[in-house]
Amino acid sequence: MKKKTSVRTKFIRTATKVAMPALQVLCAPPKLENIKKALFIQPHPDDNQIGAGGTIAYLVNKGVEVYELTVLDDRYTDLTYKGEGYTVRQKEALAAQEKLGMKNAGFLGFGDRTRATSREIADKITPIIREIKPDAIFTVDPNLASECHEDHIKVGNAVKFAFMDAGFDFVPELVDGKPHTDTHNVFTLGFYYTDTPNTIVDISDVGEFSCYPMFEGIHKEEEEYDPMYTNGLSAMNGAPCYGTRTVRYRIEDGE
């Protein structure tokens, strides 16, 4: 004898069927078409271009205002740097930004292999997020299974912390006992250098072009700098895809 389906089971099945379309919409990755302003945060000068150069060019071509923030640089390892102006790798970053049509959000001033913690780095990133107020933030995936670079892991986690902290009015601490009034909620957090992509970006319209010319002029000026150690890129189009993990993607009702 066939067992009857209980009323409870029927209700659950019906509710699931009705709710599924809405759940699929809510759980879907954010669309790049909704981004008006983006902030790409890289551990080192070149990471954004290598990992997401094509996506950056794609966004810029769509009219998106794209900023770049560099966390680490060679200020302690560039032997030609005298403490003023820009280091070789900072110049490379600025040249890459100009080539791609990005805006510079600054250099945080941490040296390669910094002893600073992810929390300390996050506290420096949070005010910049609040100032720029991006719709989306992109950085390296700190959870990449094969990631062994401590700088990448540390900065990736710092960006995750800052992504959340920017929306809290009590972070980093109250000002004269009062909450912050410049908080900003970011709705999309994207990771490149990822092994779990959920979004593929078609960058075929961007075209292929080399990054090397933007560095060539820099190294001609730096006679003491050995070009064998250049941080130049071989291709500006970067990886043909980027991965996004929606840590916090909400639909506001406008209230």
Where are these regions (language model features)?
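Active-site rim/loop-helix segments in enzyme catalytic domains that contact anionic ligands
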Residues: K2-I132
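Metal-dependent de-N-acetylase/amidase catalytic core
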Residues: K2-I41, S118-E255
